Amino acid sequence: MYNGILPVFKDRGLTSHDVVFKLRKILKTKKVGHTGTLDPEVSGVLPICIGSATKVSDYIMEMGKTYKATVSLGITTTTEDQTGEILEQTAVNEQDVSAKSIDDVLQQFKGELIQIPPMYSSVKVNGKKLYEYARNNQVVERPERKVNIYQINRISDLRFVDDTCQFDMIVECGKGTYIRTLATDIGKALGLPAHMSKLTRTQSGGFDINESLTLEDIKSLHEHDTLLEKLFPIEYGLKGIEQILITDNAIKGKILNGQKFYKAEFKQNIDDIVIMVDNETHKVLAIYEPHPEKLDEIKPKKVFN
């Protein structure tokens, strides 16, 4: 039985659930989960949690992501990417846009932004996913969401192809950011129709695309009993959360039994979630959080036993 995190390379054409389904068959276990949906037409790294590591998937999802995207100026589509039908089309040439004007606009999108999710997305409104409304030609009011763009930079020359202007950019962002919506909004800021014509996720949850494994890699490693050495430990998915090292065996036992504690029993000031770590093995024992009612106590959120 495997317990850990695998950075998987998702090919275009597969859904995130397809990857989970295939891995369940390869590894012969149902305890497999992904760390946030990656659209079918997007390739890149998809961290997969296996066994007890499924308990930390929410924390991996909260970590930042990095994308390499191609923006095409001159065309907007129904889906905001290359798969949709054309909504608006304008010929773009070298007199209409420059590298400097694009670079200036990109920096306007750095920081906290308000985004409206695209109609073709899995965001739910009134219990239904937006793409279900879109397929029935229904447009509904979509909730605004705050997203964070930490870095955004053009990384290629401008390419003028078939009356469009294309360029590549790198975007470092927080959870819930729609890059295709960002591409469309960049076009609006330039006064031009735009869409995202290609997208690759290069980093997610602290994992890089260069260390990710294909499904074929994983199948081969599993068959040769060498997959275990490629697994990242559960602790890797909890980076950035304060640790409390536990040396007392009696306290370890209480933690593994899911008992509550008084905050005063620990030296640290506990104002947020913390992870209890075995001082000898450096393995995570549990995740604890402040009690919502008893302010002087902490209670277990997840226990790893």
UniProtKB/Swiss-Prot annotation:
CDD domains given in the database record: PseudoU_synth_EcTruB (cd02573)
Origin superkingdom: Bacteria
GO molecular function: RNA binding; tRNA pseudouridine(55) synthase activity
Keywords attached to this entry: Isomerase, tRNA processing
GO biological process, one term: tRNA pseudouridine synthesis
Residues forming coiled coils: none
Keyword field contains tRNA processing: yes
Transmembrane segments: none
Pfam entry (one): TruB_C_2
Top enzyme category: isomerase
Entry similarity comment: Belongs to the pseudouridine synthase TruB family. Type 1 subfamily.
Protein name: tRNA pseudouridine synthase B
Species classification: Bacteria, Bacillati, Bacillota, Bacilli, Bacillales
